[in-house]
């Protein structure tokens, strides 16, 4: 919601704090497929941008009528509409929204009021690219692996909000390291789940997670007009593989090969025994 509000405020010329994003209300928005699949910014973002531009066009027409100027000469910044070069004489967007109800300037556009509804249909998905690297330490006696450092490099296309993007990638990376080192659904021979509580299902704790460094490299997408790419899933996907590869590298002298995760001490010990048997 934060990034969508940023886009709306930027395109319209409104103050960010004045933008309210309503989500999940099926009485107002019956059409939608949810927020999964790394598609919020890639799909919803362009629709929000186009809608804000249409509202801005209407606001400029109303402001031009009130300020006795051409719509092309109207600027809207920080929630104020004014004639270019004369910012001292301005009208708030709130006042314009009231004036728009009766404004004759909107007659050619078909309806009164500062409102718009648009849809964006992407031609295909926006592929995001990235990589992750882990530094681990393995105790060859206890077969315990410990994560020492972690880094993420990701291409989000255009970064609308770097803090949110980095946070998503870091949160996803924690999920990935959990899959690589800790979390596992364990069943007995009858199919009974044995790791069904936090007593048995190991989730990452603060001391399991090192500082996660994030670097963003921007290569804008050509699939949507904002140039954005998905981020939500990208942080979680490479983690387990990065950690297992790091463990294999740490144990390269033992010729260890790990084919299954998470890399628990039991699995690492078994992999070391298998390597010894292979000679």
Show where each model-derived region lies:
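Cofactor-binding beta-sheet edge motifs in enzyme active sites
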Residues: 1-279
């Amino acid at each position: 919601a934060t990034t969508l509000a940023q886009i709306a405020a930027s395109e319209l010329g409104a103050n960010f704090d004045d933008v309210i994003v309503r989500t999940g209300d099926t009485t107002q928005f019956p059409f939608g497929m949810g927020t999964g699949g790394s598609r919020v910014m890639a799909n919803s973002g362009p629709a929000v941008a186009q809608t804000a531009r249409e509202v801005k066009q209407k606001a400029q027409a109303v402001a031009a009528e009130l300020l006795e100027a051409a719509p092309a000469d109207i600027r809207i910044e920080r929630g104020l509409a004014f004639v270019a070069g004369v910012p001292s004489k301005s009208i708030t967007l709130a006042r314009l929204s009231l004036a728009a109800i009766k404004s004759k300037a909107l007659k050619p556009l078909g309806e009164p009021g500062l409102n718009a509804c648009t849809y964006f249909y992407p031609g295909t998905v926006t592929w995001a690219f990235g990589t992750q690297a882990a530094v681990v330490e393995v105790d060859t006696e206890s077969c315990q692996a410990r994560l020492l450092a972690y880094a993420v490099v990701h291409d989000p296309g255009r970064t609308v909000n770097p803090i949110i993007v980095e946070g998503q990638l870091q949160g996803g990376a924690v999920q990935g390291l959990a899959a690589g080192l800790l979390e596992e659904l364990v069943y007995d021979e009858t199919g009974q789940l044995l790791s069904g509580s936090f007593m048995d299902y190991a989730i990452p704790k603060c001391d399991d997670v090192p500082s996660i460094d994030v670097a963003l490299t921007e290569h804008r997408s050509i699939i949507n007009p904002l140039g954005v790419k998905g981020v939500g899933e990208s942080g979680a996907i490479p983690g387990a593989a990065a950690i297992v590869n790091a463990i294999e590298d740490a144990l390269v002298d033992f010729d260890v090969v790990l084919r299954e995760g998470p890399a628990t001490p039991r699995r690492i010990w078994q992999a070391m025994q298998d390597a010894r048997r292979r000679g």
